[in-house]
Amino acid sequence: MSDIVWHQHSIDKQSRADQKGQNPILLWFTGLSGSGKSTLAGALERALFDAGFHTYLLDGDNVRHGLCKDLGFSADDRDENLRRVGEVAKLMVDAGLVVLSAFISPTREERERVRALFDQGQFIEVHVSTPIEVCEARDPKGLYSKARAGEIKNFTGISAPYETPTAAELTIDTSKGDLATQVSALLDYLAAIQVIDSEKLKKAV
């Protein structure tokens, strides 16, 4: 039997959420490199923040500067990377925040493992379904060129698979329509499921 026990605090997550006037959730943006995950998540966070919501964006590149800087890109390391991010996101949701995360997260198993950490309705999977042809044409970091040249091994979409979500709450192709329209669709969805108050939302659009 473990000597480590869970310490129950006097302030629970519902109290923290009530103080902030919002329903905390995790929006998990998944898709290929260059699909527009970070751009879309960042624009949504800006809209929510400007309307007075308490948010935080976890970005795949940023966490590797600190939390996950000891990890590489092997299958095991990528799995551990997402495990850590999922646990951090859970703490943030417990703190009452609307959390946005932008990670390739290529396998259904990885994504479902993170989903299992959260209460029903608190994990919203957003599949950024931009076609690989568009992602490769964008190639903002030059990664596709390196992968095609064999300089990057196990690159998702080229030499490693991406498992398309089968039950994502939302699917957005960033090659169709403009960013403002896509953000508005996300805001409308969050209002419809009563994650955010529609009156506060009016300030964000």
UniProtKB/Swiss-Prot annotation:
<dbReference type="InterPro" id="IPR027417">
    <property type="entry name" value="P-loop_NTPase"/>
</dbReference>
<feature type="binding site">
    <location>
        <begin position="31"/>
        <end position="38"/>
    </location>
    <ligand>
        <name>ATP</name>
    </ligand>
</feature>
<keyword id="KW-0067">ATP-binding</keyword>
<feature type="active site" description="Phosphoserine intermediate">
    <location>
        <position position="105"/>
    </location>
</feature>
<keyword id="KW-0547">Nucleotide-binding</keyword>
<keyword id="KW-0808">Transferase</keyword>
<dbReference type="GO" id="GO:0070814">
    <property type="term" value="P:hydrogen sulfide biosynthetic process"/>
</dbReference>
<dbReference type="Pfam" id="PF01583">
    <property type="entry name" value="APS_kinase"/>
</dbReference>
<keyword id="KW-0597">Phosphoprotein</keyword>
<keyword id="KW-0418">Kinase</keyword>
<comment type="function">
    <text>Catalyzes the synthesis of activated sulfate.</text>
</comment>
<dbReference type="InterPro" id="IPR002891">
    <property type="entry name" value="APS_kinase"/>
</dbReference>
<comment type="pathway">
    <text>Sulfur metabolism; hydrogen sulfide biosynthesis; sulfite from sulfate: step 2/3.</text>
</comment>
<dbReference type="GO" id="GO:0005524">
    <property type="term" value="F:ATP binding"/>
</dbReference>
<dbReference type="GO" id="GO:0000103">
    <property type="term" value="P:sulfate assimilation"/>
</dbReference>
<dbReference type="GO" id="GO:0004020">
    <property type="term" value="F:adenylylsulfate kinase activity"/>
</dbReference>
<comment type="similarity">
    <text>Belongs to the APS kinase family.</text>
</comment>
<protein>
    <recommendedName>
        <fullName>Adenylyl-sulfate kinase</fullName>
        <ecNumber>2.7.1.25</ecNumber>
    </recommendedName>
</protein>
